[in-house]
């Protein structure tokens, strides 16, 4: 059974071996996320090499995402996890040290120290650990814990009521982007985006490294990101609803409503949307998710999210492969009751997705024709990815087989809802249509006499302007018997 909603897996110590990565792929992983808040270029380089070798061996559109560290406040390295209890105190310092309970822990960046005030609430590790500032000095802050937990290396930290303007991109981020371009990665997730100028500045950096069109996903994690959402969505290529930091920066009870708003607004703008953070969090430790987590994933799918993301579940959890299998099962079951026609009602007058006027005229009508004809799939040839992205935003019941000669587009489409990318060297319509049908049969999407709707370009045309309703048999004949018994 196919799954239209895509799965993003964060890769970490629990999964960064060839054997585990192949198991994640078999379980349903579509995108491998590398979190550059952790690790080194050397360690990420090893993982990237394994992923590239794997996707070449298996001939699958597995995308690789670089997630930037961004301008966040974060703890430094600790010698070993520091166990804390209510009433315990810990010193945060500006100098770089290997942290411990006795010596304290480094707090990055050091420019925040002058802005910290006593009695300010402190949230660590997505709010799991709470504390309060009891002593604030120029290069040192002392906090007192209000609940128990473990302080680990590189965990996020949020200080309420702090007013400091952090730069959008750090020197580390720029070095990481350069590394990502050199490694020919497929997607960039930009942390703590506040406005469209942040996206523009990152594009200029990518352009200076020779990759101006590298897709950028804007992570919405603070009140400015929410406030400027519409302009950010137009500037970016995709949106990530980063619920962890969002639930710290804003009231946690606001997150569900914002999630629904951003999922719909992303589609209307023509951008894919990723729902992230704590989706199957309990599976970090337990073999089964909670009922609430299953409902959370299902509701994100009902909202029309393009992809759902696993973080600690696959990076460091005890059951990473089972977490992906569970996520895929939830997707498949939920999509049985997905209201596909409800997503036809789309106010896309302000869409930022640039497609030809021909496709705008025939795209939605084509989906309706295919459904009325009981077709089993839509096949579309694309050089830029625009046509399948345009069709995907309407969330059609029919799988979209996207045939492309562009390797960057092939991997980039891995995150698009309902799109199944296929790489080709052919531009002849008869040939690539034949190849797409073979692909559909091999993937279990199509069979012998299924009807298909093909979007293509007419002779001498540069843009998609032609619809053809045909059958798999006619497209494959006379070689169908060699493929389907």
UniProtKB/Swiss-Prot annotation:
What domain of life is recorded for the organism? Bacteria
**Keywords for the protein's UniProt record, in alphabetical order:** ATP-binding, Glycolysis, Kinase, Magnesium, Metal-binding, Nucleotide-binding, Potassium, Pyruvate, Transferase
The record's GO molecular-function terms, alphabetically, read: ATP binding; kinase activity; magnesium ion binding; potassium ion binding; pyruvate kinase activity
Q: Site feature Transition state stabilizer: at which residues?
A: 219
Q: Which residues bind substrate?
A: 33, 244-245, 277
Per the record, what are the reactions this protein catalyses? pyruvate + ATP = phosphoenolpyruvate + ADP + H(+)
Q: What is its EC number?
A: 2.7.1.40
Necessary cofactors: Mg(2+); K(+)
InterPro entries assigned to the protein according to its UniProt record, in alphabetical order: Pyr_Knase (IPR001697), Pyrv/PenolPyrv_kinase-like_dom (IPR015813), Pyrv_kinase-like_dom_sf (IPR040442), Pyrv_Knase-like_insert_dom_sf (IPR011037), Pyrv_Knase_brl (IPR015793), Pyrv_Knase_C (IPR015795), Pyrv_Knase_C_sf (IPR036918), Pyrv_Knase_insert_dom_sf (IPR015806)
Give binding positions for K(+): 35, 37, 67-68
> What Gene3D superfamilies does this protein map onto?
Phosphoenolpyruvate-binding domains (3.20.20.60), PK beta-barrel domain-like (2.40.33.10), Pyruvate kinase, C-terminal domain (3.40.1380.20)
Asked if the Swiss-Prot or TrEMBL record annotates the protein with the keyword Transferase, the reply is yes
Establish whether keyword Transcription regulation is in the entry.
no
Residues binding Mg(2+) are 221, 245
Which pathway or pathways does this protein act in?
Answer: Carbohydrate degradation; glycolysis; pyruvate from D-glyceraldehyde 3-phosphate: step 5/5
Provide the residue positions that the database annotates as binding ATP. Answer: 35-38, 74, 155
State the oligomer form and interacting partners.
Homotetramer.
| Family of this protein | Belongs to the pyruvate kinase family.
Q: What is this protein called?
A: Pyruvate kinase
Name of the gene: pyk
